[in-house]
A protein has these predicted regions:
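Absolute protein N-terminus
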Residues: 1-2, 84
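C-terminal structural segments of small proteins and small subunits
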Residues: 53-84
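Amphipathic, hydrophobic secondary-structure cores in small proteins
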Residues: 2-22, 26-57
Length: 84
């Protein structure tokens, strides 16, 4: 199983997103964004299970919670941006 990381520029926005996901029954964990993924800002992410990522993306968009990008670590340990 893989995890997806929704990156945010602020911890406040990440925590707002976490509350939205919790209300929708989607488990998430607020974590520091891995250094290699940080673009700018303080670098926090919501880590969600890959099988709930599509629902999480939809819930965040519906609630107008703006994330920066979504990343997933592949089987070789390389990070890639999720664009689907």
């Amino acid at each position: 199983m893989y995890d997806d990381y929704f990156t945010f520029r602020s911890v406040t926005t990440a925590m707002r997103g976490s509350r939205i996901l919790e209300a929708m029954g989607i488990q998430s964990l607020t974590v520091r964004t891995p250094k290699q993924l940080q673009q700018q800002g303080c670098g926090y992410s919501l880590r969600v299970r890959g099988d709930t990522a599509a629902r999480a993306k939809h819930a965040l968009k519906q609630a107008e919670i703006q994330y920066s990008r979504i990343y997933r670590k592949d089987e070789n340990g390389q990070w890639r941006e999720v664009t689907e």
